[in-house]
Amino acid sequence: MLLPRHHDPIVAIATAPGRGAVGIVRVSGRGLGALIEAVCGRALQPRHAHYGPFLDAQGEAIDQGLALHFPAPHSYTGEEVLELQAHGGPVLLQLLLARCLEAAAQPDARSGLPRLRGLRVAEPGEFTERAFLNDKLDLAQAEAVADLIDASTEAAARSAGRALAGAFSQQVDTLRDRLIELRMLVEATLDFPEEEIDFLEKADARGRLARIAEALDAVLARAKQGALLREGLRVVLAGQPNVGKSSLLNALAGAELAIVTPIAGTTRDKVAETIQIEGVPLHVVDTAGLRAEDDARDEVERIGMQRSWGAIGEADAVIFLHDLTRAGDPGYDAAERDIEQRLPAGVHVLDVHNKADAAAAGAAALAPQALRLSARTGEGLDTLRRRLLQLAGWQAGSEGVFIARTRHLQALQATAEHLVRARQLADRADAALDLLAEELRLAHDALGAITGRYTPDELLGDIFSRFCIGK
């Protein structure tokens, strides 16, 4: 459900925990005037930065800094907002937070009433929730605030910035408007069956549906790119012991993350690292070596192989690593076939043949899609990076990509499915207009869930609870 008591005035430290040059305490609510005078010692001119002391209950300065007052509705939350920009010490900011709560509860000298009744510390995400409730942001923009804060790459940050500026929402709203127009035509045909004019034929309903579906496909493609920037791709390195999985992880990461020795079975557990390729995060997992029929040499290796298979089952892609120097060995080749047969269906597998620098000249020819590289020298690594991006569906230089989440993709895909059924109904000679109208309504509602127009309260509460306090 929605966060509770969203009419109460709220206060929180808006900057990250820890020491810094500047820290901010933010207050949002109605009627902040008496609180402002108590803490700042004077009224503040709206939307101007005022330098001066922040006062305790005895009128002594706690600190000096900037105070800014934003009257409603011209603020982040759409309510009246006060921001106190002080020095960024954790103890100092807690003092200012406590002072705001204390001053709010004390009676105003003129009215005798509390200066700001009900002021409380904000819940996580409550400032942004109020911005959503007061129509300052739609839901996709509100989520983009959190994604911008959490962005781990420049590309993700820029895409989140586009979503915050409304790039995603505008495209969704355009689709919704076109669906509304078509729904009106269908409803008119249902409501006035005696009219000689066929509203659907006159308005080219089938053509409209096709054009809406085409536009939706374009938005979905951009959303998939944005989701990739946010979520990344989980890639598992798999193969027999001592084929160079840890060396490849180190080469891709550009750092010595995993222990590398000539001894087979050095890696006994998963080692994970997030790397970036052209701004796309890849979560690469190095796993313990696999053996034919899980023929472990000891209990530790058996557990390690179990975890390796578990990681493979959760992967978006598997780099199945082979050792070129051992190709042709009967025991090695038999184990390769056993492992390959046990790889789960539906997982993308890249066949990568390592140790090209040490392989004998004239080594066996590889399959057309297989890659040949050397984790030690770096030969073939750029080709592997490009293949991983292709596998992820990333298109270099994509324009207008906005950040997107899994729920956005699900909503867009649901919309597409309803449009497919709507087009099938519209193409029938005996089209059931009531069924067509229902499919259009469901498509319309699915789109509305992205921006928050038709979103259950439970989902809203879950979204905003994931924000940091003060945002």
Curated annotation (Swiss-Prot):
It comes from Methylibium petroleiphilum (strain ATCC BAA-1232 / LMG 22953 / PM1). Signal peptide: none annotated. PANTHER family: TRNA MODIFICATION GTPASE GTPBP3, TRNA MODIFICATION GTPASE GTPBP3, MITOCHONDRIAL. Belongs to the TRAFAC class TrmE-Era-EngA-EngB-Septin-like GTPase superfamily. TrmE GTPase family. It is an enzyme of class 3 (hydrolase). CDD domains: trmE, TrmE_N. GTP binds at residues 242-247, 261-267, 286-289, 354-357, 374-376. Mg(2+) binds at S246, T267. Keywords: Cytoplasm, GTP-binding, Hydrolase, Magnesium, Metal-binding, Nucleotide-binding, Potassium, tRNA processing. Binds 1 potassium ion per subunit. InterPro entries: G_TrmE, GTP-bd, GTP-bd_TrmE_N, GTPase_MnmE, MnmE_dom2, MnmE_helical, P-loop_NTPase, Small_GTP-bd. GO terms for cellular component: cytosol. SUPFAM superfamilies: P-loop containing nucleoside triphosphate hydrolases (SSF52540), TrmE connector domain (SSF116878). (6S)-5-formyl-5,6,7,8-tetrahydrofolate binds at R26, E83, K136, K471. Its main location: cytoplasm. Homodimer. Heterotetramer of two MnmE and two MnmG subunits. This is tRNA modification GTPase MnmE.
